[in-house]
């Protein structure tokens, strides 16, 4: 029965309606729906007073029950947002609600996972929260354009017209909005009735709201709260404090809140039975989180309690729920599995330490009890435990040792090896799983192992009960642990009650070997947890704070980790933020040292989309030279360089930008073979070897880094050795003779490199632009080499006898290299000129050189009747035929034949001795023969 206002033959306005079941409602109506403020009562005495939306509870309201009172936000008849449930004893359950359960508390768990405890990742945290906006929900966009939509048809446009969505006056036939489409215009009418005489929720007034937690459900809750932010209940009930995680203004915790907090702590402890009982009785939600978004699932996963993880997921926990910092349970496990200490140094991120000089004198390390105080986390990078079961101890670098003092020991073995746990010789050769079991005095493998495992409980490095009946220190023995020994020690330690050392643990429980075994066990357990989360649907692409989990596995060089993530759909088109050069996983993998980098690159290339993706480091400079070079003393006088007939012109300029993965691999100096293998993989997948970064091509980078294997691979795979480089680098031949990179290879290797470049098509006659200040000139690679040579004025200009022995060697090496390049240039000129008519070329040279030279010295003239200018003169390259220079020198022709040019008396004499003595006579004979022919013609005429 209805009593109230009508309109359009429908309930419209204020009224009261009761049902035969005893339920009743009095409040506002709109089009036969309970819509607006009102009170709904049930036969059992419970009632709800608040906002209704199309006959559903939505917005802030108060739910009165027999023994409880709830005040909070609703949506579609369900609790959906901040709320407070009050009990008769005065306690209150405060937090964010979803249906009948708390899903986020206002209390923070002290032991929760937080990125604030990992300052090494602070530079990666560049993510800024998005701003909450409701206007986007009201927009109905067309989507794809007509040309892009493969299923475009004209009737699609009707879907955007509210007048065509429903028949006219549809309310006459039905008002059941649950089964009818909701048009945009009708939704605006409904919202206008709800927010009558109030600021519309779509008007962004006051300070902006930012999304606190990016979990999809919590984003919807935050938007729902933002929509009703101007309601009086939002302020009077202190709902804003709940969103901010502030609980100080409320009564003591109620039962649901207490159980939720305790369940998070029990998940950390691994109390499966207690959590199972709570979830079975529905006392708490499996998806509950503390004030910072630290969920029960995250607590169980980070502590490797896989049984609880399975239980929570079976009970509906969201495996991809994020914390307020943006971390999922999977990303937390990856951050623990790959600490920053496990990351490999690489050239992509510029994390390779600068080489340090070794100590001049041996250092004797001082062993003390502090050696035993290393925490468990530091062992993550000392013990490398791949997921498939192969183990390798990788001790950190240690100081040099003095020669060992030989001595004797009784019985060939120790009576008490309790010190072995704390005195394993980290300074000896690396302890690998495939190494011999024991070297030196420990001959019996099994007995030695039992002694190690058994006697560690009787004595340690600092124990007063240690007995060592030998005059030889344990440090004097080189002990290598095999895979079997590590597995057995780890198995024995797995029986310990404590999974990790605690502050109350005695000193012998902190032994190095024991903690290594515990670390191995914990890593294996966490690896199983990671695999479980991925198998249960964890998204490896969801979390980007501090970085995507694929980056963690790549940076740590874990092949199995990368393979696992790729098998579960990890994206490879991700990158760092612009502040970190937008590096991709392929960039970092190409720079990883060791065989792991090769395998990871191969895995990524099978899933990669753009092998030539560029980093945003186009403004960076490739390691400036260690030499403090002054401006070159070589004078530039706008020399034109070689004529165009001597070289082939470039068809297109190379593309320049940030580093590609190929640049990363070619820049490496750590492992030539692995770098070569990575380059081969990249090229086989279509990497472009002719892109520039910082003026360098991959070929010039490999030359600068001294990797001959990569140079050979690039040239074999079609890299262009004549690619013009920018930023004053010239070409690959110029880089080969640059002083900045001369320390990368010896003299024989430099000469072999030049030969290899020329044999693969490098043109030493290619013009090279040289600039210094406002002056410039065009020369060749030889001129570039001399230009750089004269920048080191100490060696280039000082008298030879005043140089130090090392400087003399440097001077001679540089001169030898430049002379060899001059030889190659001369041979290239001769090879090019051999394609032309030698007589005509010689006449052209004489025609151009004789007039300029006769101003100073009278010489022979051309035969009469041979006017070169009228018949077309061949432009020839003017350079010193001995040293190869064409810039900054004064060139003079041979006074006898005018066939060559030299720059100095030294070059003239040396050229005469080495090659020109014979050629000069031949050229003079040509002139004599031409004169005779010319004379005969004159006599005949």
Curated annotation (Swiss-Prot):
Which GO molecular function annotation, any one, does this entry have? zinc ion binding
**Where is Zn(2+) 1 bound in this sequence?**
880, 883, 903, 907
Name the positions where Zn(2+) 2 binds: 894, 897, 916, 920
ZnF (MYND-type) intervals: 880-920
ANK repeat residues? 292-321, 513-542, 545-574, 581-613, 657-691, 694-723, 737-766
Q: Which domain of life is it from?
A: Eukaryota
Question: Spans of the MORN repeats?
Answer: 2-24, 25-47, 70-92
Q: Which Pfam family is one of this chain's hits?
A: Ank_2
Keywords for this entry? ANK repeat, Metal-binding, Repeat, Zinc, Zinc-finger
Write down the InterPro entries for this protein, in alphabetical order.
Answer: Ankyrin-MYND_domain-protein, Ankyrin_rpt, Ankyrin_rpt-contain_sf, MORN, Znf_MYND
> What pairs make up the disulfide bonds?
none
Record keyword rRNA-binding present? no
Record's protein name: Ankyrin repeat and MYND domain-containing protein 1
- UniProt gene name: ANKMY1
């Amino acid at each position: 029965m209805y009593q109230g206002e009508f309109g359009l033959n429908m309930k419209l306005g204020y009224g009261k309606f009761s049902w035969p079941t005893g339920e009743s409602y009095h409040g506002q109506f709109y089009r036969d729906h309970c819509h607006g403020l009102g009170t709904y009562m049930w036969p059992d005495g419970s009632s709800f007073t608040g906002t209704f939306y199309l006959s559903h509870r939505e917005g802030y309201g108060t739910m009165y029950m027999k023994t409880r009172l709830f005040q909070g936000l609703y949506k579609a008849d369900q609790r959906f947002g901040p709320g407070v449930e009050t009990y008769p004893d005065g306690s209150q359950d405060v937090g964010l609600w979803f249906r009948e359960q708390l899903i986020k508390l206002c209390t923070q768990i002290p032991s929760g996972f937080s990125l604030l405890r990992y300052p090494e990742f602070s530079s990666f945290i560049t993510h800024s929260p998005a701003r909450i906006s409701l206007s986007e929900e009201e927009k109905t966009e067309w989507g794809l354009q007509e040309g892009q939509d493969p299923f475009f048809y004209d009737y699609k446009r009707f879907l955007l017209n509210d007048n065509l969505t429903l028949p006219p006056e549809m309310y006459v036939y039905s008002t059941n909005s649950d089964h009818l489409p909701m048009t945009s215009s009708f939704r605006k009418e409904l919202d206008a009735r709800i927010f009558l005489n109030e600021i519309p929720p779509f008007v962004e007034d006051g300070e902006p709201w930012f999304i606190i937690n990016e979990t999809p459900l919590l984003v919807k809750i935050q938007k729902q709260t933002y929509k009703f932010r101007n309601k009086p209940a939002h302020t009077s009930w202190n709902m804003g404090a709940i969103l901010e995680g502030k609980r100080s203004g409320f009564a003591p915790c109620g039962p649901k809140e207490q159980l939720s907090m305790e369940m998070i702590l029990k998940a950390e402890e691994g109390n499966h039975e207690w959590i199972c009982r709570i979830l079975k009785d529905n006392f708490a939600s499996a998806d509950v989180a503390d004030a910072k978004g630290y969920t029960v699932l995250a607590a169980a996963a980070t502590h490797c309690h896989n049984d609880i993880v399975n239980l929570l997921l079976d009970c509906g926990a969201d495996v991809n729920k994020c914390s307020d910092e943006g971390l999922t349970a999977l990303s937390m496990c990856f951050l623990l599995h790959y600490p920053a200490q496990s990351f490999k140094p690489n050239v992509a991120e510029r994390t390779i330490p600068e080489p340090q000089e070794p100590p001049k004198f041996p250092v004797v390390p001082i062993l003390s009890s502090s050696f035993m105080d290393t925490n468990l986390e530091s062992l993550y990078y000392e013990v490398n435990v791949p997921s498939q079961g192969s183990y390798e101890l990788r001790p950190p670098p240690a100081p040099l040792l003095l020669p060992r003092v030989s001595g004797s020991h009784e019985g060939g073995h120790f009576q008490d090896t309790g010190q072995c746990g704390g005195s394993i010789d980290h300074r000896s050769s690396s302890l690998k799983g495939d190494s011999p079991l024991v070297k030196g005095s420990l001959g019996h493998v099994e007995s030695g192992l039992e002694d190690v495992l058994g006697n560690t409980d009787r004595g340690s490095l600092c124990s007063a009960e240690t007995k060592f009946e030998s005059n030889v220190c344990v440090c004097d023995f080189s002990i290598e642990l095999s895979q079997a020994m590590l597995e057995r020690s780890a198995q024995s330690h797995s029986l310990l009650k404590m999974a990790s050392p605690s502050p109350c643990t005695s000193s012998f429980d902190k032994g190095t070997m024991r903690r290594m075994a515990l670390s191995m066990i914990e890593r294996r357990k966490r690896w199983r947890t990671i695999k479980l989360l991925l198998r249960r649907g964890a998204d490896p692409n969801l979390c980007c704070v501090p970085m995507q989990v694929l980056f963690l596995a790549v940076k740590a060089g874990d092949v199995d980790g990368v393979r696992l993530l790729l098998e579960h759909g990890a994206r490879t088109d991700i990158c760092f933020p612009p502040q970190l050069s937008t590096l991709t996983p392929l960039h970092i993998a190409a720079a990883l040292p060791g065989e792991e980098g090769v395998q990871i690159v191969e895995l990524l290339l099978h899933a990669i989309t753009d092998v030539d993706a560029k980093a945003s480091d186009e403004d960076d400079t490739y390691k400036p030279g260690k030499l403090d070079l002054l401006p070159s003393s070589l004078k530039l006088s706008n020399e034109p360089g070689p004529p165009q007939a001597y070289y082939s012109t470039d068809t297109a300029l190379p593309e320049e930008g940030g580093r590609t993965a190929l640049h990363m691999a070619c820049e490496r100096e750590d492992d030539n073979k692995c770098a070569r293998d990575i380059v081969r993989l990249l090229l086989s997948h279509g990497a472009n070897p002719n892109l520039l970064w910082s003026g360098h091509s991959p070929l010039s980078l490999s030359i600068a880094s001294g990797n001959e294997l990569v140079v050979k691979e690039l040239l074999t795979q079609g890299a262009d050795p004549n690619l013009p480089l920018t930023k004053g680098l010239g070409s690959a031949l110029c880089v080969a003779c640059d002083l900045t990179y001369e320390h990368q290879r010896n003299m024989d290797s430099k000469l072999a490199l030049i030969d290899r470049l020329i044999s693969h098509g490098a043109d030493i006659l290619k013009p090279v632009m040289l600039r210094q200040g406002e002056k410039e000139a065009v020369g060749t690679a030889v001129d570039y080499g001399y230009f750089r040579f004269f920048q080191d004025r100490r060696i280039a200009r000082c008298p030879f006898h005043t140089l130090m022995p090392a400087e003399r060697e440097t001077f001679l090496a540089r001169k030898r290299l430049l002379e060899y390049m001059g030889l190659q240039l001369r041979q290239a000129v001769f090879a090019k000129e051999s394609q032309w008519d030698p007589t005509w070329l010689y006449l052209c040279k004489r025609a151009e050189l004789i007039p300029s030279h006769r101003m100073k010295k009278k010489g022979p003239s051309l035969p009469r009747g041979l006017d070169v200018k009228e018949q077309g003169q061949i432009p020839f390259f003017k350079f010193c035929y001995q040293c190869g220079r064409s810039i900054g020198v004064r060139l003079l022709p041979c006074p006898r034949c005018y066939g060559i040019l030299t720059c100095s008396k030294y070059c003239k004499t040396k050229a005469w001795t080495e090659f020109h003595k014979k050629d000069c006579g031949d050229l003079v004979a040509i002139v004599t023969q031409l004169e005779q022919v010319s004379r005969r013609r004159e006599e005949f005429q």
